[in-house]
Amino acid sequence: MTKQLIILSLFLLTVFSVAAQTKVVKTSNGFELQRNGKPYYIKGVGGDVNMEKIVAIGANSVRTWGVERAQEVLDEAQRNGLTVMLGLWVQHERHGFDYNNQDKVAKQLAYFKTVIDRFKNHPALLIWGVGNEVDLNYTNPNVWNAIQDIAKYVHDTDPNHPTTTVTAGLDSLEAAFITARCPDIDIYSINTYGDIGNVPNHIAKFGWNGPYMITEWGPNGHWESPQTKWGVSIEQNSTEKKEVYFNRYKNYIEKNSNTCLGSYAFLWGAKQEYTETWYGLFSKNNIPTEPIDALEEVFTGNALTNPAPTILNFQVDQQKATDNIELKSSGIFDANINIQLAENVSIEKANYNWRIIEESTDKKSGGDVEDAATEITG
């Protein structure tokens, strides 16, 4: 019996470690991603928390930016029937990395070789994400040679998974560099927000003739939004964001599925970036926000029976955010919000939690870690 159990354990371990094969296939009208020989359109989210909820909304894949928790994320994804775009965090010039320093570049490549060797046979692995926004505020195009060396190692040692690299938005210069210097990149990936509508037309125009993915997308970025007269960007409310998620997916992602292999919505989790609510699909207390309803609708194709309330109006002192609200600190002012429930939905009581938070003084770029702004109490 003991011998039989040992053999069975070895068999299960072997089965678990067999890689699923992902391929990019040229079709009569574009490209298709296939997993184990079957079409696989990526309906993904950027982030790896609440995987049961990811499955519940009809998503099929998660994206990471680095490998700090790779084993845990891959294993949990496998248990939940999800795949993983595993990010290899290639160092940024803007953080001090010198791509003219061959010793440092070689050490980085050697590290990623060990990572690739370790995880290449995991059954939840879908795609290798070789670098994220290495083009942001950079001056040295040698970074693309480093991207190519990593991607080539993937192709040399892992026949089962394609490679992608991710740029901050889409422009002709980076498309030209990747086309010329990175022949082992299979898929071009773009992080894009308000400019997402230009991607389908621009990507071929800029010289990339292969497939692409949208690896971050969501509301308008804080750099793309209207500002107050004192220069602070105005965040969309959750209802406005829900409409944006729905329309951008339907019009610019799904509609171009002959060349766009899918997407990863940003951000599945909570994050302080300009504000604590701008990009996160969950509050810092892990409460889901209204845009998740939009993702469930587009991923499943079904209308929700119990969606979140719609915000009709939100005002302070009878003014909305775009009115450049100025209030005296010693005054007392009314704040009002009007919501609407979907048909056949009723609630006995709505709870409102009002918070006043100072404007952030730790605003950075590229998603770098920011300190939370101070909440005003009393």
Residue ranges and their predicted role:
Residues T165-V166, S189-I190, Y212-E216:
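Active-site neighborhood of phospho(di)ester-bond hydrolases with catalytic His/Asp-centered motifs
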Residues V24-S28, E32-I185, N198, F206-W208, ...:
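Active-site mouth of glycoside hydrolases
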Residues V134, T192, W217:
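Active-site metal-binding loops of divalent metal-dependent hydrolases
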Residues M1-Q21:
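Bacterial Sec-dependent N-terminal signal peptides
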Residues K152, N201, K250:
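Active-site phosphate/pyrophosphate- and oxyanion-stabilizing loops and adjacent acidic/basic residues
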Residues T27-S28, R35, P39, G44, ...:
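Substrate-binding clefts and catalytic carboxylate motifs of secreted carbohydrate-active enzymes
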Residues G169-P200, E224-P226, G269-E276:
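Substrate-binding cleft/loops of secretory-pathway carbohydrate-active enzymes
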Residues T374-G378:
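Solvent-exposed segments in extracellular or luminal domains encompassing
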